[in-house]
Amino acid sequence: MENSGLLALPLNAATIVPEGAILLALLSSLLVDLAGEKTASRWVPPICYAGLGSALILLASQWNSTLSPSFLGAFLADNLAIAFRAIIATSTLFSLMISWRYVERSGAPMGEYAAILLAATLGAMFLCGSTDLVSIFVSLETLSVSSYLLAGYMKQDARSSEAALKYLLVGSATAAVFLYGASLLYGLTGGSTNLDAVALALQSSDTPVAALALVFVLATVAFKIAAVPFHQWTPDVYEGAPTPIVAFLSVGSKTAGFALALRLLVGCFESFDIQWKFLFSLLAILSMVLGNIVALSQTSMKRMLAYSSIGQAGFVMIGLVCGTEDGFAAMILYLATYLFMNMGAFACVILFSIRTGSDLIADYAGLYQKDPLVTIGLSLCLLSLGGIPPMLGFFGKIYLFFAGWADHQYLLVVTGLITSVVSIYYYISVIRMMVVIEPKEASDVVKSYAAVNWNIPGLNPLRVALLVCVIVTGIGGIFSNPLFQWANSAVAGTPILQKVIVTALGTTGTIS
């Protein structure tokens, strides 16, 4: 009877047409790559742009559409899934634009590289709308395995291979932990993997088994978003992996992790609301404090941005813990703003690395004299990450802090404010080094800085990505209110979030 009920559900394949466009670009990239590197370098970029651009247009056309489960109840294209999938697709688009020159210099096959990155994108996008434990695991592993391959893609670099091995070992352990937690949830439901059935079973189950399943699920989510103490892989992987891949992991993979948190923790563990929010609050505080304090002592730009991303995850977790409409909306808004400011920062780091081969913060000394564009772009993105007004990041943080304060999350908000000040210190230290130091005090690397030449193949897409990210980061604060309304619309069009919000309002009304 259960099988006949499942078969009665529609496939509704139209909901994953955006992913279909990306899959078509993936297969086309592999086919073009067979024709030789010269042909691939000419055709792979436009193929990827067409696939990702089509996916974004198709996602926009699905906004506020009628909700119906897809693939026997394993996927749901609600507004939450659409918003997160759009952020991930955009992060991949920027990652590819800042990748081409980097890949050409390394001599790696361009079509193969693009195909693996698009595969990771597919895994992340499917994860955002998965409503079944099996589809969640398959999506999670698609994202993870592709990420392992990308982290170790520069085989001639020992640090890249080391990063891939560490990422693989920790990621494999996390996959085992999730599988064990999923098996416990499967047992509690009496044999169903659908998240609605899991949520229903957990409402009437306060057993230690359910609590253990919560711990395993929370550990999986914490690993994907690089929250303390599940962050150990992050600095080493960020430092050793190719920089464009680090940019994708810091935005695309993290966004998928927060989508997973909303689907599982908010959607399924409503009866354990107090417990998981307490644990997540603890992780948020640890992430904000450790991420920003350890970043102070870093000498590598990529390691500094790695610890910065740990702290940024802590800020986003404030919105998740709130469990209110404003909290969820602020969380989505901040992830969208983080996309532009972080991608802009990594674009500048890649440009500097291409021209100097260095990743040391000290080597940025006096850069303004030789490369004003990289200096101004990196400065604006770092100021935005620090939450300096009127940058886009300031409005993202202020919405998060307002939502936290309104929900009486005073400790989280105060911790966020203090650690934001700490982050401003190390961001401004980099800016001061680039701008204030006299030409005679510039680093040896900057003194021998190569002349800026944008006619080199692969640099023009990087420049476009850099300019777009910097412009949006610099003046995007003007449009923060429409962005917040978009985020509110995403929350309003997501049934699992509305259910939690209504329940919270009812509880508040009862208490008052």
UniProtKB/Swiss-Prot annotation:
Molecular function in Gene Ontology: NADH dehydrogenase (ubiquinone) activity; NADH:ubiquinone reductase (non-electrogenic) activity; quinone binding
InterPro entries reported in the protein's UniProt record: NADH-Q_OxRdtase_suN/2 (IPR010096), ND/Mrp_TM (IPR001750)
Subunit structure: NDH-1 can be composed of about 15 different subunits; different subcomplexes with different compositions have been identified which probably have different functions.
Bilayer topology annotation: Multi-pass membrane protein
Protein name as catalogued: NAD(P)H-quinone oxidoreductase subunit 2, organellar chromatophore
Reaction(s) catalysed by this chain's protein: a plastoquinone + NADH + (n+1) H(+)(in) = a plastoquinol + NAD(+) + n H(+)(out); a plastoquinone + NADPH + (n+1) H(+)(in) = a plastoquinol + NADP(+) + n H(+)(out)
Entry's EC annotation: 7.1.1.-
Keyword vocabulary terms for this entry: Membrane, NAD, NADP, Organellar chromatophore, Plastid, Plastoquinone, Quinone, Thylakoid, Translocase, Transmembrane, Transmembrane helix
Subcellular location: Plastid, Organellar chromatophore thylakoid membrane
Species of the source: Paulinella chromatophora
Record-level GO cellular component terms: organellar chromatophore thylakoid membrane; plasma membrane; plastid
